[in-house]
Each structure stands twice: as C-alpha cells, then as structure tokens.
From Swiss-Prot:
Keywords: Cytoplasm, Immunity, Innate immunity, Isopeptide bond, Mitochondrion, Nucleus, Transit peptide, Ubl conjugation. This is Evolutionarily conserved signaling intermediate in Toll pathway, mitochondrial. Residues 1-48 form a transit peptide. It comes from the Eukaryota. Residues 403-434 are annotated as: Disordered. One of its GO terms (biological process) is regulation of oxidoreductase activity. Adapter protein that plays a role in different signaling pathways including TLRs and IL-1 pathways or innate antiviral induction signaling. Plays a role in the activation of NF-kappa-B by forming a signal complex with TRAF6 and TAK1/MAP3K7 to activate TAK1/MAP3K7 leading to activation of IKKs. Once ubiquitinated, interacts with the dissociated RELA and NFKB1 proteins and translocates to the nucleus where it induces NF-kappa-B-dependent gene expression. One of its GO terms (molecular function) is DNA-binding transcription factor activity. It is found in: Cytoplasm; Nucleus; Mitochondrion.
Amino acid sequence: MSWVQVNLLARGLSRGWGSICRTVLSGTPFAQPSLQARGLHCSAVTHKDDVWLVPRPSEPQKKPIKVPAMHEDLFRPSGNGEQDKASFLNAVRSFGEHNVRKRGHVDFIYLALRKMPEFGVERDLSVYNLLLDVFPKEVFRPRNAIQRIFVHYPRQQECGVAVLEQMERHGVMPNTETEFLLIQVFGHKSYPMLKFLRMKLWFTRFKNINPYPVPRDLPQDPLDLAKLGLRHMEPDLSAKVTVYQMSLPSESTGIEDPTQPHIVGIQSPDQQAALARHNPSRPVFVEGPFPLWLRNKCVYYHILRADLPPPEEETVEEIPEEWNLYYPMQLDLEYSRSAWDNYEFDMDEVTEGPVFAMCMTGAHDQATLVKWIQGLQETNPTLAQIPVVFRLARSTGELLATTRLEGQSPPHSPPKGPEEDDEAIQAQQRQGQS
C-alpha cells in the first residue's frame, strides 16, 4: 500500500468519525437510515445559508448625513443681520472654543464650505487656512508603512481634499502656511498633500495663460460692464466705444420713457470703411442676443453683419511692400515639389460675412436696436441707404425695417416662412435699386 492510499484512507476515516460524532451530539439514533446513500466523506446535516444557530443582527438603515443643529446656529446672522468676513471668522473661532475635543469637525468644515459664498469669503486664502486649522494636529498622520499604503483616516483626508478643491475652483493659490498646516495635520504622504503639490505646480503655469485676462473685480454699473465686454471682444485697439443712450435712474419721474435702457456700441475704422464699401442693394442684418460670460456674470450683445459677397464682388487688397521688411506677410517661394505633394492644408474653415459693428443694450427689443442703428447713421451715412433686417432670437420672426424713416419705428410682422422672407428681401432690394 503506497503512502498516497494511506493518506486517502486516513482522510476518509476522519470525516466518517466526524459525521458520527455530530450525529451523537444532535440526538439522532444510529439506527435511523439516511434518506440518501451517503459516503463516509459526506455529512448527515445539509448546509443551508438561511439557517444559523445565532440569529444575524438586523442591518441598520443608512440615513443621510445631517449636520448638527448647533453647527447651523453658528452661521446664523446676528442681531445686525450682516453676513461678512468678520461674522464668518467669529463662527469658526467659536466652534473651536466651545468644542475643545473638536468632535464633528468634518461636518462643520463641510458646512463652512457651503456657507462661504453667502458670506463672500470664497476667494479669501486666510479663511481657508483657518478651516484647515480646525483639524486636530498630529492625529491623522500615518505612523508606519501599512498606514501609508492604505488610506489613513479616509473621511478626514477627503474633507481636506474638498477644501483644496474649492480653493482651486475659485482660483485661490495656496501658500506656505497652507503647506505647513497640511503637513502638521495629514503628513507628507497623504492625498491632501498630493493635491497641494499638484495645485502648486499647475497654478503657477496656468496663472497667466489667458491672453485676454478679465479683471478679478468686475464693475457693478451695467454701463461700465458693457464697455468692458465690448473691449474684451474687439481685437482692434483703435476701435471707439460710443454711448448712444444712458439708462435713467429708477427714481426719475415725469419722463416720456421712464424705462430707457442703455445703448453702448463699438466700431473700428476698418469696419466703417467696410460698411462704406458695402453694396446698398444688399441688406445688412442685426442679430442677437448672444451671451458673453465675464467670470460669473453673463452679458448679451448684438452684431450688425452682412452676408458673404459673391466671388465676383470680392476685392483682394495687395499688401504694401514696406510691410514685409521685417515680418513678411506674403512669401512666394518656389521650391521643387513632386506630383505627390499636397498643396492644401486639411483645415475646416467656415467663411462668414463681415461684421460692421457690435453693441450691448439694456433691452433686447427691436425699438431699442433701431435707436442704435440711428446712432450709427451719424458716423456711417451710407447706412441710411441700406435696408436693415432684424433677426432677433426672442422675436416671432425676421422683422424687416428700412432706416430711411428715422421718426417711425418699424412695424411688427407675424411669423413668416422662408419663402415669404426671401420674397420680402427681394422686394426690398428692388426698392433700394430704384
């Protein structure tokens, strides 16, 4: 008998004796036959997942995380009702004074992050450093290699990363004090510290990446905000901003038009020259409003444009030779090329018509835009001989108006189909030619 057979026999005998002992302990007589033929290696008691000697404890129902009411009371407005930086700092300091052991500090920090925009401190670096100072020191730092491999105190580390992410969202650059607090709370090998190193690397590289920067503090006056938006869109520095109409204050009474909106426009000398060369038989279009975001504020603008002229009417301007002295704009280089060379670049370009002017108004109706067109006629006399078509996004359809009648506002027309619009434009063109 080999040692393999001896090993198998001993294993079968041990399983058989185990089944006999379980039968004796359970009180089942030996004479009771089994319902199924069982070997010595099988147990007489079948295993069931739902049968347990000790009942399982009931699983507690997961409830949403609720911030304690005492934390909410800290951020409620005081008697004067002002929500400013001083009241926010007072709420954070009072949490540390009344809660020495800093229990519930994670919920408090999450609540403070949500309340920061209400107090206007979402861009203040000192406030973020004060929130990081709420964490207990030298408690969440990993002490050995096992704690460094696994996330040590994951909920606290996620809260620290949330503070840094809100700083990144509002463009707040951390400083050396932030780094010292993160090392003191979480240590060098932690996720908040890794987030800090990434912010320190990329913030310095992307700080001045925008070639057209927008000031941090935007003007509150709608007129100044419109001037800033138009200057931000117009690449020509020689363009002139003109205020065609000032908005009236809300206290003004006894005026014919108490709701007079502001009208601000911009036009460059090149745009004036292009409008002077425009064919009077072809209409120009007032389109809009189009949105423009200046940080967290959205303004709307309108444009005065025309369709692309036909190829036979296009004039190619020759670049003077004195412009090519140091920075050539045209190069005619005849290199030896084979028949397989591709002379065309693979670029997707959409050619659009010229834009003659832009404006921002306090109201986006046709009556306000007609005043803008009338103001443009003072510096562009040829505009009085060109038909103007209003294509407003919020109007019922394309409204056709001829700016020769300065005293009358163009009547509103019902919605038209594309065929009726073409017929109306052609009729207006024939009228302009006559």
